[in-house]
């Protein structure tokens, strides 16, 4: 019984193993993007610590609350007389505080923008930092351009409880140390991170850490470690030894914002998010020496970034604010949980019916579609043969070689033709009776293919036969002679690179052995 002639198998390069890491696959799930245009630069983003984790966006003279479910504005706080800064939630999510360029600090109900619960004249200078204490809900911290950080009791806010001085430039950030409610870390444009003990009556810092660049943000990642950013890097400090642990300079421009989150459904137990003026937002793993794991590129300088807190809902949103006024909201796609629906009790299933009803209605929707089974015995039309395949099947070796270099032919197909002719021992036959115009395409392809190690052996075999058959023709043709000179130069260059690679390999073996 006759069989169909087998097709020529296209030559394919070996596939590399999958290089994506579990961390990359997790952060790539933030695919659903929404862009919101604000009137001015988005300077601060804060998530509500309590469910459903709505987030406040500070821009120009207003603060907007976005719903974490719909990603739409649900509340707008616009009763500010000047540019507003750093709106943030209290730990219980019930209050929202913000400072403005006049120095006034306002405290609102988180979802009632009409009434101001408290107004504090913190300073006559712009108040850039306002933040509630993470454990004591009555304590509010503010930092203004008068280089003074103040702690207020909102139940009696006529005067500050404590004033923290010592900064010689603007204070732009502060952070409370977890598990140590009496410690406050501040960062200023004089390049120093100062640590204060609020239990002492004095207002001078316990000690200072030198960041060497104007400090934009300070955040605590553990009871003994804080991270500061400024310039094109961020630094990790150990509070027990007062020394720098790590320094990461993965950015080309100044790092503007830091955010620390814990992940319950991620390969990373925790993550440090950093944004920069170069338009990048990158993810670092604190448990892996703060190595970068993933990143996003935005259209402009990023001034603020935040990730929703990790609870039963998971880290659902990544929000970045740009200097152009663009707010980018990236949402992680939801996982399909079919097993939950299958395991749910019947009492919670609205469409569930009793067994008697199901037996009564059995077969009512059958339409006889399984009584007649039609077998399609038509022979599938095979893929159309290419020109070089037809010529090879018809033993037209020279024409098959010409078809390999037609314009638009893929490199893999050209390599397939050359390998097939070499496998069949028809290299000399395919090269007989050629002149300058028919040899030039082959030599041009060899000149490009010699750089690829996967096709170097094919190029060497074909060029050797060309030199053997057409040595005199190459000397008399200026075009072919120039191609051969270029090919010789490139071969020498590749040999030089191979020798250098072997030298480097030997050096690395000495270092690793």
Swiss-Prot record:
GO terms for cellular component: 90S preribosome; nucleolus; nucleoplasm; rDNA heterochromatin; small-subunit processome; t-UTP complex. It is found in: Nucleus, Nucleolus. Keywords: Nucleus, Repeat, Ribonucleoprotein, Ribosome biogenesis, rRNA processing, Transcription, WD repeat. GO terms for biological process: maturation of SSU-rRNA; maturation of SSU-rRNA from tricistronic rRNA transcript (SSU-rRNA, 5.8S rRNA, LSU-rRNA); positive regulation of transcription by RNA polymerase I; rRNA processing. It comes from the Eukaryota. One of its GO terms (molecular function) is U3 snoRNA binding. InterPro entries: U3_snoRNA-assocProt_15_C, WD40/YVTN_repeat-like_dom_sf, WD40_repeat_CS, WD40_repeat_dom_sf, WD40_rpt. WD repeats lie at residues 37-78, 79-118, 124-162, 166-206, 210-247, 250-294. Residues 332-354 are annotated as: Disordered. Involved in nucleolar processing of pre-18S ribosomal RNA. Required for optimal pre-ribosomal RNA transcription by RNA polymerase I together with a subset of U3 proteins required for transcription (t-UTPs). Present with 358 molecules/cell in log phase SD medium. Interacts with snoRNA U3. Interacts with MPP10. Component of the ribosomal small subunit (SSU) processome composed of at least 40 protein subunits and snoRNA U3. In the absence of snoRNA3, forms a complex with other t-UTPs. This complex can associate with pre-18S ribosomal RNAs. This is U3 small nucleolar RNA-associated protein 15. It comes from Saccharomyces cerevisiae (strain ATCC 204508 / S288c) (Baker's yeast).
């Amino acid at each position: 019984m006759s069989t169909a002639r087998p097709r020529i198998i296209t030559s394919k390069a070996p596939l590399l193993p999958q290089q994506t890491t579990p961390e990359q696959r997790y952060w790539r799930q933030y695919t659903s993007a929404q862009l919101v245009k604000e009137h001015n630069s988005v300077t601060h983003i804060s998530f509500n610590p309590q469910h459903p984790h709505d987030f406040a966006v500070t821009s120009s003279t207003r603060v907007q609350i976005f719903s974490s479910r719909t990603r739409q504005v649900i509340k707008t706080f616009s009763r500010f007389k000047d540019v507003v800064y750093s709106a943030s939630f209290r730990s219980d999510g019930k209050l929202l505080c913000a400072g403005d360029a006049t120095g006034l600090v306002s405290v609102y109900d988180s979802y009632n923008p009409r009434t101001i619960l408290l107004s504090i004249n913190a300073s006559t200078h712009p108040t850039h930092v306002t933040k509630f204490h993470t454990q004591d809900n009555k304590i509010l911290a503010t930092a203004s351009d008068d280089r003074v950080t103040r702690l207020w009791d909102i139940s009696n806010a006529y005067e500050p409880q404590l004033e923290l001085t010592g900064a010689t430039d603007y204070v732009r950030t502060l952070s409370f140390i977890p598990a140590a409610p009496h410690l406050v870390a501040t960062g200023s444009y004089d390049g120093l991170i100062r640590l204060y003990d609020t239990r002492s009556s004095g207002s001078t810092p316990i000690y200072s850490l030198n960041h060497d660049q104007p400090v934009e943000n300070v955040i605590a990642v553990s009871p003994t470690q804080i991270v500061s950013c400024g310039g094109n890097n961020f630094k990790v400090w150990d509070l027990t030894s007062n020394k720098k642990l790590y320094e990461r300079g993965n950015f080309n421009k100044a790092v503007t914002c830091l955010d620390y989150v814990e992940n319950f459904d991620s390969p990373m137990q925790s993550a440090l998010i950093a944004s920069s003026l170069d338009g990048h937002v990158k993810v670092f793993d604190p448990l892996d020496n703060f190595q970068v794991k993933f990143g996003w590129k935005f259209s402009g300088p990023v001034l603020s970034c935040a990730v929703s807190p990790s609870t039963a809902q998971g880290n659902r949103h990544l929000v970045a604010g740009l200097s152009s006024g663009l707010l980018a909201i990236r949402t992680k796609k939801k996982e399909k949980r079919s097993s939950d629906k299958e395991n749910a009790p019947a009492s919670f299933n609205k469409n569930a019916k009793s067994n008697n009803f199901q037996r009564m209605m059995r077969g009512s929707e059958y339409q006889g579609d399984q009584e007649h089974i039609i077998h399609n015995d038509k022979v599938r039309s095979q893929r159309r043969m290419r020109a070089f395949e037809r010529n090879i099947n018809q033993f037209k070796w020279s024409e098959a070689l010409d078809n390999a270099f037609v314009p638009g032919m893929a490199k893999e197909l050209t390599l397939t033709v050359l390998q097939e002719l070499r496998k069949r021992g028809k290299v000399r036959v395919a090269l007989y009776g050629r002149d300058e115009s028919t040899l030039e395409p082959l030599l041009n392809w060899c000149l490009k293919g010699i750089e690829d190690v996967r096709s170097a052996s094919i190029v060497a075999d074909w060029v050797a036969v060309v030199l053997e058959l057409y040595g005199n023709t190459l000397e008399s043709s200026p075009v072919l002679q120039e191609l051969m000179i270029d090919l010789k130069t490139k071969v020498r260059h590749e040999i030089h690179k191979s020798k250098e690679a072997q030298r480097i390999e030997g050096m690395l073996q000495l270092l690793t052995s």
